[in-house]
Amino acid sequence: LVDSINSYWMSEYKIDGFRFDFTKGFSNTPHGTEDPWGGNYDAARISLLKRMADEIWARNPLAFVIFEHLAVNSEEKVLADYGILLWGNLNSNYAEAAMAYHDNGKSDFSWINYKKRTWNDPHVVGYMVSHDEERLAFKCYTWGNSMDDYIIKDTTIALKRLTMNALFFFTVPGPKMIWQF
């Protein structure tokens, strides 16, 4: 059914790609309480998702195939190496950087880089915020750190911190997802 719907949209409306939500849920493998979100490596799911991508690429070899997968890196690497783009959620890390909380690597956003993940191609669609997370500005205004008279809860300072975040975000190689509300 998914294949026929994708095919129809591609031929009828000239859609040039698809983004699938929560693809780690595209599985028939039962996941117990030790893995309630199904994030562990699942070879059967990989086969299914590759088949779906192949069906899309059979109709348009240049079509974009994007997954919000968010599973273990070993599984995402297989999909990325196959040519699939994958969501890269770095909301928490960019928020910690904007709020100036750096202890224990909380503000380390290097995971947005495909090389850090040991992927062969820049197939991380990195993002700082989406509809699933709280806005970074709100976090700065509510929980921003302070150092003497440098108060991140201050609007001017918070916006400068968010500008700095954007500079770091856009300089990392690879595609980006920019969410606007």
Task: Give, region by region, the residue ranges found by the protein language model.
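Substrate-binding/active-site clefts of carbohydrate-active enzymes
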Residues: 1-41, 52-60
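Conserved alpha/beta catalytic core and glycan-binding cleft of carbohydrate-active enzymes
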Residues: 14, 47-181
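Acidic-and-aromatic substrate-binding clefts and catalytic sites of carbohydrate-active enzymes
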Residues: 26, 43, 72-74
